């Protein structure tokens, strides 16, 4: 699968984003020192490990991984695809005391919550962000930034 990775930078807001659609294949344990990561299962099913937690994610499920949290996933069905959005932890710096990190509650989604309004909204703005990032229009960066801000609204 060809992977297009879109990088967006908004230095005035300390917001740096990357987004792409990924084919979930192998188990590669890793972490991001200064980034949060959303993973949204677009199709298929995957097993996900975040720190000491292991869980199965199905279509429309969402997980958020905080900075420095080790994580990995692998597909349990053929053609599993995920939308991955990574964004800088620095974006929250003005709202935190020294040494604190921003914490989002309620992740991962699951069978009972994945279709709820919160997760539907996250999927909508994530899709809008990817769509805007992939456009060549001069207004696309504005649309992407607006979608990112709405996506990150806790």
Explain the meaning of each model-derived region.
Residues 1-58, 101-103:
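Generic protein-terminus/edge-of-domain signal
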Residues 2-17, 70-135, 153-154:
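A hydrophobic/aromatic-rich effector-binding and dimerization subdomain
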Residues 37-40, 121-128, 147:
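Amphipathic, well-ordered alpha-helical segments in soluble domains
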Residues 39, 63, 83:
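Conserved GNAT-family N-acetyltransferase fold
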Residues 57-70:
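Conserved metal-binding segment of the jelly-roll/cupin
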Residues 133-150:
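All-alpha amphipathic helical-bundle segments outside canonical DNA-binding/catalytic cores
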């Amino acid at each position: 699968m060809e992977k297009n990775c879109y990088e967006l930078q908004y230095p005035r807001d300390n917001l740096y984003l990357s987004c792409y659609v990924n084919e979930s294949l192998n188990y590669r344990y890793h972490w991001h020192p200064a980034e949060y990561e959303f993973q949204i299962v677009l199709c298929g099913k995957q097993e996900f490990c975040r720190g000491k937690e292991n869980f199965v994610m199905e279509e429309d499920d969402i997980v958020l991984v905080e900075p420095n949290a080790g994580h990995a996933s692998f597909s349990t069905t053929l053609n599993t695809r995920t939308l991955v959005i990574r964004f800088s932890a620095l974006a929250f710096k003005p709202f935190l005391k020294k040494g604190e990190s921003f914490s989002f509650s309620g992740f991962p989604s699951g069978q009972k919550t994945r279709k709820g309004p919160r997760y539907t909204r996250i999927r909508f703005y994530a899709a809008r962000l990817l769509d805007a990032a992939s456009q060549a229009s001069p207004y696309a960066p504005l649309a992407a930034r607006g979608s990112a801000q709405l996506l990150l609204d806790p």
